[in-house]
Amino acid sequence: MRVKDTLNLGRTKFPMRGKLPVTEAQREQLWEENKVYELRQKLNEGKPTFVLHDGPPYANGNIHIGHAMNKISKDFIVRYKSMSGYRAPYVPGWDTHGLPIEHQLTKSGYDRKKMSLTEFRDLCREYALKQVDKQRTDFKRLGVSGEWDHPYLTLDKEFEAAQIRVFGEFAKKGLLYQAKKPVYWSWSSESALAEAEVEYHDVVAKTAFFVEQIKDGKGRLDNDTYLVVWTTTPWTVPASEAVAVNPKFDYSVVNPANDDRKFVVATDLLEKLAEKLGWEDYEVVDHLMGQELEGMTTQHPYLDRDLLVGLADYVTADAGTGLVHTAPGYGDDDYNFGKKYDLPIFAPINDQGVLTKENGEGFEGVFYQDADDVSLQKLEENNALLLQEPLQHSYPFDWRTKQPIIFRATDQWFVSIEKMRQNILDALEDVKYHPEWGKVRLRNMIKDRGDWVISRQRVWGVPLPIFYAEDGTPIMEEETINHVAELFAKYGSNVWFEREAKDLLPEGYTNEHSPNGKFTKETDIMDVWFDSGSSHQGVLAERDYLTYPADLYLEGSDQYRGWFNSSLITSVVCSGHAPYKEIVSQGFTLDKRGNKMSKSQGNVIDPNKVVQQMGAEIIRLWVMSADTSADVRVSMGTFQQISEAYRKLRNTFRFLLANTSDFNPEENTVSYEKLQSVDKYMLVKLNHFLKTMREDFDNYDFLDAYKVLINFVNNDLSAFYMNIAKDVLYIEAENSEVRRSMQTVFYDILLTLVKLLTPILPHTTEEVWSYMNEPEDFVQLTEIPDPRTFAGEEELLSKWDDFMEVRSHVLKSLEEARNAKLIGKSLEAQVDLYLTDDQKQLLDSLNENIQLLLGVSALHVHPADEAPADADQYNDGVAVKVTTANGETCARCRMVKEDVGSDPAYPELCARCAAIVRENFPETAEDGLEE
């Protein structure tokens, strides 16, 4: 018999390399065939419900790494709750209406103007469903578990019907109105936009300082006086109706040398302006307060129109002249100013951003950006332009087309936020936020939010269920809206475009505003944020196994102005409360330099490629390791690093499996009271680790959980317990108490880790589970254990923590001895340890083989005051001296012992190994051992 055959070398077929790209897909197929998600739901019937409601991604294009981070984070929570005593169904959703899908069809050569609306809408639907199928495959391949065969889509008939009923609640409460107001207008999309559909970029604008001659100075200013007006949008000057001044500003009347005109500017800006305009020598001839200018009129610089001077607090002295050109059809402030002074709301520009003939000669047919130059030229021709200069400032863009937008007054439908603002703010108080600053952010957004423009001039979406009577009166009655909802539930929203208005109204419907029984219908559709914002009614309130409000919404931080926001508004209107009990927000995924990922930059990471090259588990572990509450930088190098951490976890599982392969939990388990002290210590540590991990999971703090996990695996297991375990597990007799004691804890660690990590690494833990003799077919169908406490554990931990401090000194001295070439491996060392009486008592109280715990061949303990001068001294009074151990190396345990060969039958073994072999392999006493 060989020496090797007398050892209990761990054995397992669990592979060191996971071959994840191949094995994960096979395992996912197995889950699907065995309906593991459905089995888990069945197991949890009757338990408390936890619902994470999925914010629907847009059904267009491939998933990106941000999608992966979001969906995997949700999967962590749903899987964890499912294994922790909750019924946690997960219904994935998709946002399937909207402009990008229309654009995709246009790019593919379809012209919506050359086909019927229903034909075009059918093509949109077909495209959206294909995108859903594609994204669903990708999400499933990330290991995300859920109702993939029964998701929610905003184009579903039932969802559209629910959305119409939500609209009905707004109508019933008088929160809808139609008005001609300036809205964000996207000429590239030919539609109004909501705030959530706008992003800001820095642009360089052409600004103009120009003059308007006083026409009626109210006896205070003469006709040879000119107001110096400033604008950042010269193309809007043809629509100018007024000049706004601040009532509290002091204004100077200035007469520059070599100019017979007098100019009015804000006194605080005079010095800066004089420098810009080259007024080296000027005289201030008068002062007046802004409020004195109110009611004066000026002459438009190049059109035959009188302009009013009015008061506005929004005029600042940060830039310009303190006098602002005002066009009520082109901005919120201008609009409110216009309403205050009863000015025309005038926006002479078409849907494509092209100016119309109402702007005057030279402007008709000119694109608004080109019209800047036309306007500047006209100002110059009329001797009204004092200065033109560039200005860099933040400007709104269409978030989908990436083109700049304009403010334009058009007839739109609005939701009055003002009427219910306080109710919405009150509802926020009942919500818990992660991170906590989310509350302030959402609160401020609601506080500052203007009325919500919900109409869109597009075709692929849910129609506004509004009818018009013969005299133009809008009809939004409960009866008509409910009837439309019923039609949508039966036929889908296409019915709106297929039928005449009279065929969409309830049978026999009459209205006093239509004496002839004639009606028309609205042609605009709803903002897609109204679609997804209605999901609490279309999904949570519709499916009886879900709950409303949901327990949790988890999305990117941009959703404070998007889905969190629109869902909150609609929910408060429908039910008087928020649709969620908790919100978790995440940052964006950026490249390694902190730049936004974009195809044009070539810095996009495709999660599908990472899956194909490394496996979904690597992405999942990365998500756990990332601080997702802020923006996350990621590169392929990040995944390489995570692969190393994964390899460490995998090898930990392999070591635990190998060294429990001959352990039967039912027969070999040692009770806590009978465990060796070091094993008790590790069992207590394991349960403290489990408690912390569960707390982190409960708080959705997966980053901290990752740190706790890596610390436990690297320090408690790899660097200590698994390191010292080899001597016990390999060397001691197979059935010895000390070995079974350690295996008991090993198995507990294995069982805890495999269950605890299933929400994070389900492919790997299911693979590990297949090598364990547990009754359940899938680890996903088990429960994560609750942490246990043990009698006297605090005292035990205190002792062992003190010992670990002593051990750290010994390890440091051993490292120095290795560096000095005094020893090679630690097993070549003898350690002389010099301790105080308290420290010696500590070691004795552990009742352990301290030499084994230190990993050396010989240990001698002495009083602290006997420490020689060349010993390593440590602050707590410990001294350590490392020398080369005397004796020969035992062929079995590899320790250097003076008693090697003391048993003549085993000349190559130390006394300890000889006794173990003689007792367990008696035949070798005569035959001897081979190397």
Swiss-Prot record:
Localization in the cell: Cytoplasm
CDD domains the record matches: Anticodon_Ia_Ile_BEm, IleRS_core
Record bears the keyword Zinc: yes
Binding locations of ATP: K599
Pfam families in the cross-refs: Anticodon_1 (PF08264), tRNA-synt_1 (PF00133), zf-FPG_IleRS (PF06827)
UniProt-listed NCBIfam families: ileS (TIGR00392)
Function: Catalyzes the attachment of isoleucine to tRNA(Ile). As IleRS can inadvertently accommodate and process structurally similar amino acids such as valine, to avoid such errors it has two additional distinct tRNA(Ile)-dependent editing activities. One activity is designated as 'pretransfer' editing and involves the hydrolysis of activated Val-AMP. The other activity is designated 'posttransfer' editing and involves deacylation of mischarged Val-tRNA(Ile).
Domain text: IleRS has two distinct active sites: one for aminoacylation and one for editing. The misactivated valine is translocated from the active site to the editing site, which sterically excludes the correctly activated isoleucine. The single editing site contains two valyl binding pockets, one specific for each substrate (Val-AMP or Val-tRNA(Ile)).
HAMAP family per UniProt: Ile_tRNA_synth_type1 (MF_02002)
Protein name: Isoleucine--tRNA ligase
Lineage start: Bacteria, Bacillati, Bacillota, Bacilli, Lactobacillales
Gene: ileS
